[in-house]
Regions:
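Short, charged, surface-exposed secondary-structure boundary motifs
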Residues: 237-243
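Catalytic-core region of carbohydrate-active enzymes that cleave or remodel glycosidic bonds
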Residues: 56, 61, 190-206, 217-235, ...
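Active-site mouth of glycoside hydrolases
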Residues: 1-225
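Single-residue recognition of alpha-helix boundary sites
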Residues: 145-148, 237, 288
Length: 308
């Protein structure tokens, strides 16, 4: 996303030649700031990204993007987490737990969306070529909260406080039915803070979130978004040991059209539906079926966005 201009033009030409009309700009948040500090935008790399957006727009190609994907921090940036933030999965958990991290997120979102692209003349929030915004990439709280044992302990302590305030039993920890209510409350509080900031800066772009994993709990959270977005992979490599990975080498068809079929129940009848990451992973012998299955079902169910 921050490539030299000549590469932006070449890639935009190539995408237009193939007939693509939408590109997702991804993993750029770490490149567009200096040292992970959201208060210090990297002007040169942001300029390159602006040029890419403009180059795509000139060829009739729209853009969608994320606010947080993989930005990392040196020591001392997050008061409650003084050590360096090297694992971006931890950010998604810290975002729920601490106001300071949410404030950092809102600051970067405000800066990047209010920034004027010199090649289009639009602020990102007003640019018609930028069609939608994803907030935090793959941030399902049901799968993220306990990945870091230190942060999981904080979650459980907060849950006990949550139960005391409501005169609920806290036994069972995360197995307690009230634990999901606790997680949902944390998430909805943050989502409303984001919504309020977007209203404040005058951003009316469609917004989505919770694009990782599937299930009723996440469907309820996606109802609070403007559209549903899902990520889906067939035969994603499975780690074996420290360095080796293996593939199943299975077709999706005898697996009940696992991909894209697994996303069918995730649609919400009153919301546009998108898949911003989908792939039959390289080295799978059945990758040729991907285009036929994906195109057929996307047309049958009238999906609104598909990005490989």
């Amino acid at each position: 996303t921050t490539m030299p201009r000549e590469w932006s033009d070449r890639i935009a030409d190539r995408l237009a030649m193939f007939g693509f009309n939408l590109v997702r700009l991804h993993h750029h948040d770490g490149e567009t700031v200096i040292g992970g500090d959201a208060r210090r935008l990297h002007k040169e790399k942001l300029d390159r990204m602006d040029y890419l957006i403009a180059a795509l727009a000139k060829r009739g190609i729209y853009t969608t993007t994320d606010i947080y994907v993989s930005r990392k921090f040196p020591a001392g940036v997050i008061p409650e987490h003084p050590e360096p933030l090297k694992n971006y999965e931890d950010y998604k958990v810290l975002f729920l737990l601490y106001d300071s991290v949410c404030d950092e997120f809102l600051h970067y979102m405000r800066e990047i969306l209010s920034h004027t692209n010199p090649y289009t003349g639009f602020q990102w929030k007003d640019d018609p070529a930028i069609v939608s915004i994803s907030l935090l990439n793959e941030n399902s709280c049901t799968t993220q909260w306990n990945r870091n044992p230190k942060l999981a302990k904080v979650f459980l302590e907060r849950f006990q406080q949550f139960c005391r305030e409501r005169n609920l039993q806290a036994e069972g920890g995360s197995a307690n039915p009230a634990f999901r209510d606790f997680l949902d409350g944390l998430y909805r509080k943050r989502l409303e803070q984001i919504r309020a900031e977007l209203r404040k800066i005058g951003c009316n772009k469609p917004v989505t979130d919770q694009n990782f994993q599937r299930g009723t709990f996440l469907a309820l959270q996606r109802e609070a978004c403007d559209y549903v977005d899902i990520h889906l992979y067939h035969d994603h490599p499975v780690r074996v040991g420290e360095k080796m990975r293996r593939f199943l080498q299975r077709s999706a068809i005898p697996l009940g059209v696992e991909v894209p079929g697994a996303c069918f129940p995730e649609r919400l009848i009153d919301k546009p539906f998108a898949i911003s990451e989908i792939e039959y992973c390289t080295a799978n012998d059945f990758r040729a079926e991907h285009a036929a299955l994906l195109g057929t079902y996307a047309a049958l169910q009238n999906w609104d966005m598909v990005i490989q």
